[in-house]
Amino acid sequence: MIEGHGDDSYKYSRPITANFSSNVYSRVDLSALKAHLCTRIDGIGNYPEPEPYTLEACLARHHHLPAEAVCVTNGATEAIYLTAQTFRGTNTAIVQPTFSEYADACRMHGHRVTSLYRFPAESEGYRLPEEVRMLWLCNPNNPTGTVVEKEYLATLISHNPQVCFVIDQSYEFFTLRPLFSAAEAAEFPNVLLLHSMTKRYAVPGLRPVSYTHLTLPTK
């Protein structure tokens, strides 16, 4: 995880009046969650499940997916770095401007990274550059808030079967525009969809709170 991410209140001893360094939604009533955690506090005396299979199975049932298609991670950040590591050395395009962690993770794992500032049009056959094998898209985007229309994105994915699309929907609860559901994304064999509970529920310190679902092979 890169330095300078923000929300680093642990560095300061004085009270913080206003925090503009993070886009976590702060007006969430966490009283029920805190009460639940208090009832489970005795669990700190035991090791947790080595792999979060129980939670993954629960999320899979919720999204009507096979359990092996869901991967729970320590925030979306871990999912980003694990994805970059799994596909190390890939020719990667990142839709810009966007969250800098995608490029950091990819460069750490030897990706050949290029920036993409516009999407191909119908007149171009919706084709991405020939050398691209992985595309990262934050949708809705951080920091611009723009949303790529679901219909266009589906067309783009269909016309580029050689590309693995990593779509980060961490901000999906901050828009009324239609986005891919897990079931819709699962119809494509080349999509990896990232979800995060951090932003909506304001729990960045509670891990794991993010999960990924995928339908593509990893070899």
What are these regions (language model features)?
Residues M1-Y47, E131:
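N-terminal "arm"/small-domain region of PLP-dependent enzymes with the aminotransferase-like
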